[in-house]
Amino acid sequence: MKKSICIEKLFVDLPFYDRFPMVRKTGFDYVEFGSWAQHDIKKIKSLLEENRLQLGCFSGDKDYNLIDPAHCKEFLEYFKRSVEAAHFLDCKNLVIHSNALGEEGRMCTDGNDLNDRTKIACATKNLLEISKIAEAEGLYLQVEPVSTYAKPGYYMTTSDSAADIIRVVGSPNVKLLYDIYHMQLMEGDLVNTLRRNADIIGYIHIGDVPGRHEPGTGEINYPYLKHVLVDELGFDGIFAFELSPLTTMDACLETMHAF
């Protein structure tokens, strides 16, 4: 099983670049973070190589929204830079948000001045365009719905709000990033939703409810979800721990390794 550590949630007592060797030291092979643009990607590349780590994903957007017609030109330009960064860092997955998340995960704009028809049309247009680039470059776009509890004003807040557009785009390189924590908050019915979208799910984010802590600390039946994903649906992608420890880091690490 491929397990990734989100270093913007874990090992946060350490400086950013010191978290990479800690991921390897604690026995994990994959690492991920949000925006690449505020970091030294040459240093990150060296740290990945020195610690024999694979970069699972990072955000392909930052300051420009997928859903806003006024952002289309800048969105595409930044995405192309993200593609270059992905190749440099040997990363196969770029996360795409309806509302771009900038430094420290801050949502840039909510787009509340736009109607739903405009947002859907713009998101579809932009995804069609960047999907062609992703296919040509051998990359995967992981479209992530996010809860309004975490990002008030975010547009794609349910699995269907992203899945419907992904299916219209129809590219094998455009997938659904299913964040179990966010989707439990927004819609529940996790197993049926996973089964319904098994053909397009490309990446899993893990965190329990409430609090976004390690599996087993909240209300979600993670052993059963894992069984459904792996044994029933044959999911072989990355399970990423985007969470913070409920008690101690040692206890959290033990739980993540046992997952």
What residue ranges belong to the model's regions?
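Active-site acidic/histidine proton-transfer and metal-coordination neighborhood
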Residues: 49, 69-175
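Active-site-adjacent beta->alpha loops and helix N-cap segments on the catalytic face
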Residues: 37-47
